[in-house]
């Protein structure tokens, strides 16, 4: 007899307005001396591990390209939640950029490991590439 398939976690992005996997923000116009210029996306985490699981979502912003994961950068935002098996967690993530340039916004999914009593990187992540330009 075959054993059941191993459980998994998943993370994906949805656009802010329609909550669909299309029309992600790619360009941000920085508005002079007004408030911070921001973009928002929905980050969705799903638990298909067969049991309750605690997750940590780290939001990081880096200039330019990413060479490896997890990204060597401090998290701008951190979210923690325990999900039941089959449960979905939707986080509205907002990113503020004030300097022109090319950015990678990274959402890393970390999973709680009871043996080490720490969150470990799941190797599941999403990257949103955004070019920020100044209003002319």
Predicted features and spans:
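Short solvent-exposed strand-capping/beta-turn motif centered on an Asx-Ser/Thr pair
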Residues: 46-51, 98-100
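Short edge beta-strand/loop segments characteristic of extracellular beta-sandwich folds
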Residues: 40-48, 94
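Short acidic, flexible loop segments centered on an aromatic residue
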Residues: 50-66, 109-110
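Beta-sheet-dominated interaction scaffolds and their linkers
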Residues: 8-42
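Terminal connector regions
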Residues: 97-136
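Short aromatic-acidic-glycine turn motif
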Residues: 3-22, 61-73, 114-119
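Intrinsically disordered, low-complexity Pro/Gly/Ser/Thr-rich segments with frequent PxxP/GP/PP motifs
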Residues: 71-100
């Amino acid at each position: 007899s075959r054993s059941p398939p191993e459980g998994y976690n998943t993370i994906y992005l949805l656009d802010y307005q329609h909550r669909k996997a299309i029309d992600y923000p790619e360009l941000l116009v920085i508005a002079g001396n007004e408030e911070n210029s921001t973009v928002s996306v929905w980050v969705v985490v799903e638990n298909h591990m067969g049991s309750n699981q605690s997750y940590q979502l780290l939001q990081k912003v880096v200039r330019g390209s990413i060479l490896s994961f997890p990204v060597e950068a401090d998290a701008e935002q951190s979210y923690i939640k325990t999900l039941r098996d089959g449960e979905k967690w939707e986080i509205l993530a907002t990113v503020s950029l004030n300097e022109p340039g090319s950015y990678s916004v990274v959402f890393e999914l970390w999973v709680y490991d009871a043996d080490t009593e720490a969150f470990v990187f799941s190797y599941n992540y999403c990257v949103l590439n955004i070019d920020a330009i100044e209003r002319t």
